[in-house]
Structures are given as structure tokens and as C-alpha cells.
Amino acid sequence: MNDLNVYGEKIRNMLLELGIYNKSDDYSPDIKYNKTFHANGYPITGLYKFLGYYDRDNNIANFPSISFTTNFSSCDVTCRVLRSGNDRIIFNGKNNEKYYKRAEKALSFLRKKYRIDAAFEFNIRINRRYRDAKGLGESAAVASATARAVAAAVFGMDAAKDRGFVSYLARHVSGSGTRSAAGNLSMWLSYPGIDDLSSIGFEIRKDDLFHFYAIPMRSRIETLNAHDYASSSIFYNAWVKSKFFDIIDIIENKFNTRMMLEYSMKDMYRLQALLISSGYIIYEKHYLDIIRKLRSSLNNYKNVYFTSDTGTSIVVMSTSMNELSRFVNDLDLDGISGNFPEKIIIEEL
């Protein structure tokens, strides 16, 4: 892992030199007991994805990753801190064991580091623009919205508006939440040996963005622990090293948009091969048929790319709205147009 730390430090220094990244500030608790705070968050689509943790307890990944936030869905969270009692989490109107376990891990970190002795109440609601799908980054939206609401209730509004600090808190809920909290086109800096407050998400830029379209897809196959499967592949270490080299290449090319979109498509194929090599087969016929359809048509379009994650939904991207629309219409794709989200909410109710 020493060489990965060296590559990671090189990337960190490059980002510091560009002036787009800084280690997160830390805050002291100033808890607003019995007051309710509301915040929202948005899902992400991974351009340059991550699988595998260096430090699973603190959700520090083995390498950096790049993603962008979308408005395919959104998440609203309310948080209230009580002086005593038990933690309570309501998800879409019901108790949810999955999110309770994830929240308890993050709250355990919060209580230990900041010496907080209190109970937390959360009400979480996902708002979808599609009926049901896997792979459109909903867990990232939950993590970032929850982190914002917690930051407001525990540390105050200044902390809740500090994207670096919110990203830091979100990472302890979900790795993908780190980039959702940063917003727009963002990178999560992570590598073996990185300092805890340094492993955060940050916005790469606000301009020169792109256009995208989602094909939401359900899957009958349960997504198990993809991180463990990926790490068990005999190709994993080579894949990890290639990630660092590609990120360095992307930075040296000033985060060229079309270069990142092209890398994203290549990364999707490598990710699929990596998972299949470890026996993790989640890709169904319907998904593969659409991938073939998209791929066979790309030669007729100079500026269209697509990607997907371990979930089966697919996102088509282009720097040209006209080219993307022509591609979607010509192939008669069934999905939804997306935009970069504009409105972040943090408020006391």
C-alpha cells in the first residue's frame, strides 16, 4: 500500500496547487436540543467509480473517485437531537433496519469523536422521478442530506453550509455521500494513509458541464457486497493502480470534460470485468441488450458516452444537448432527462 500512498500524495499536492481542494475544517458541538432541522441532498452518478475500502471503519476508499450530482431523485431529511432516549429513524414513513444500521455506525463515530451523549430522531424521505430502479445513487442523497441536517443540529449553520465538513460527515454514513455533499462535478480524495479530515469531496468546477439522460432499470438480482467481491479479484490491485494513473492524467489535462466522459465508459467495462472475474454476476439479459444497442450505435455519434455502476441503471452523457437528444430519439430510449441540481436546503423548522 506504500506506493498507493505515494500516488495519493502526488494527487493531493496537484489539487492543492490548483487551488480547488483543502483539508476540511473541524467544528465544536453547539447542540440545538429539541429543535428540528431540515436539509436535502441529491444522488450521484459515478464517472470514475470506486470499489474497495482501505479503512472500512472510517469509510476511506483505496483510491480517488469522480462523480456528478443529478436530479433523478432527491432526499429530504429532518433531524432532532434529544437529551435522552433512543435513536429513531423513519424512512419513507416506516422503520427501516438497513438505514438504522448505517446511521448507528455514523452516530457511533459522532458520539465518540465529539463526546456527544444524546439521542437522534430522523425522518428520511426519497422523492423519485421514476418508479423503481437500482444504480442511480439514492444512498448518496440520503447520506448528504442526513449529514447536512446533523451538521445544523449539532454544530450550527456555519458548519452545515461548509461543504467540506458536510462531506466529511457524509463519508461516515456512506462513501458515495462524500461526493454528493460536494455537489455538481466533484472528486472524493481518498487513498491509503490519508488523514481523516483530508478525505473529503470537493467541487471540481461549476462551468463547462454536460448533459445526461437516465435509463432507470430494476433488477431481480440482489446486490451483495460488491466491495468485497471486487477486492477478491486477482485483477483488483492492477485496477487500483490504473485508477491513480488515470486520475493524474485527468488532472494534468485540466479535467477535460470529454476525456472524463470517455474514461467513465471505459471504467464501466473494467468494473464489470472485475466483478465477473470474482463470480459477481448481476447483469441480466435486458441490461446487456441495452448495452449492446447503445454500443453498436456509438460510431454514428462523435460526442455520446454512457456509464453504469453495480446497479443496472444506465446514464447516457454528452457535452452537446443536440447530440444527446438525437441519440435518445434515434434509439427510442425509454428514460428521463437530467439536470445538475440547483437548490440546496438547510433550515430550522
Swiss-Prot record:
Keyword Disulfide bond: no
Temperature dependence: Optimum temperature is 70 degrees Celsius.
Reaction(s) this enzyme catalyzes, per UniProt: (R)-3,5-bisphosphomevalonate + H(+) = isopentenyl phosphate + phosphate + CO2
InterPro entries for this protein: Mev_decarb, MVD-like_N, MVD_Decarboxylase, Ribosomal_Su5_D2-typ_SF, Ribsml_uS5_D2-typ_fold_subgr
GO BP annotations listed: isopentenyl diphosphate biosynthetic process, mevalonate pathway
Pathway: Isoprenoid biosynthesis; isopentenyl diphosphate biosynthesis via mevalonate pathway
Coiled coil segments of this chain: none
Entry's pH dependence statement: Optimum pH is 5-5.5.
Gene3D superfamilies: 3.30.230.10
A GO molecular-function annotation: carboxy-lyase activity
Keyword Hydrolase in annotation: no
EC number of the protein: 4.1.1.110
Assigned protein family: Belongs to the mevalonate 3,5-bisphosphate decarboxylase family.
Note: It is proposed that Thermoplasmatales adapted the classical archaeal mevalonate pathway by replacing mevalonate 5-phosphate decarboxylase (MMD) with two specialized enzymes (mevalonate-3-phosphate 5-kinase and mevalonate 3,5-bisphosphate decarboxylase) in order to produce isoprenoids in extremely acidic environments. It was found that at low pH, the dual function enzyme MMD is unable to carry out the first phosphorylation step, yet retains its ability to perform decarboxylation.
Name of the protein this chain belongs to: Mevalonate 3,5-bisphosphate decarboxylase
Species for this entry: Picrophilus torridus (strain ATCC 700027 / DSM 9790 / JCM 10055 / NBRC 100828 / KAW 2/3)
Record lineage: Archaea, Methanobacteriati, Thermoplasmatota, Thermoplasmata, Thermoplasmatales
